[in-house]
Amino acid sequence: MVNDIIADSLTRIRNASMRRLEVTTLYYAKIVVSIVEVFKTKGFIKDYKVNDKDGKRSIMVQLAYDEQGKSAINEIKRISKPGRRVYKARSELKRFKNGYGTIVVSTSKGVVANDEAYKANVGGEALCSIW
């Protein structure tokens, strides 16, 4: 079993993106589904689907590429780790990479992107960044 399922999921997405794979499989967890949903709304992935095979759930993620075959993901990083939690106030969530990137934040309103957390006037735990 994986100790940090978020870091494992981000690594699987990063590796699949570097290998130019169309689809990758992630372990199922509610937090991972929430993060992948943010990636989808921001256009970093095409789509995702939760599979239930023999009682074991997994998440199939379709990666997004442009017409030239370049990945929509340039960099994906874990910010808050199990040994070192990182929290961001609302004022620290305004912009990331001049608006090209997104910080995924776990707030009291759920797992959202940094711009949505800023508009909702909440801060929270910065889970990962992507651009």
From Swiss-Prot:
Keywords: Ribonucleoprotein, Ribosomal protein, RNA-binding, rRNA-binding. InterPro entries: Ribosomal_uS8 (IPR000630), Ribosomal_uS8_CS (IPR047863), Ribosomal_uS8_sf (IPR035987). GO terms for biological process: translation. GO terms for molecular function: rRNA binding; structural constituent of ribosome. PROSITE patterns: RIBOSOMAL_S8. One of its GO terms (cellular component) is ribonucleoprotein complex. It comes from the Bacteria. It holds the Pfam family Ribosomal_S8. Part of the 30S ribosomal subunit. Contacts proteins S5 and S12. One of the primary rRNA binding proteins, it binds directly to 16S rRNA central domain where it helps coordinate assembly of the platform of the 30S subunit. NCBIfam families: PRK00136.1 (NF001109). Belongs to the universal ribosomal protein uS8 family. This is Small ribosomal subunit protein uS8. It comes from Helicobacter hepaticus (strain ATCC 51449 / 3B1).
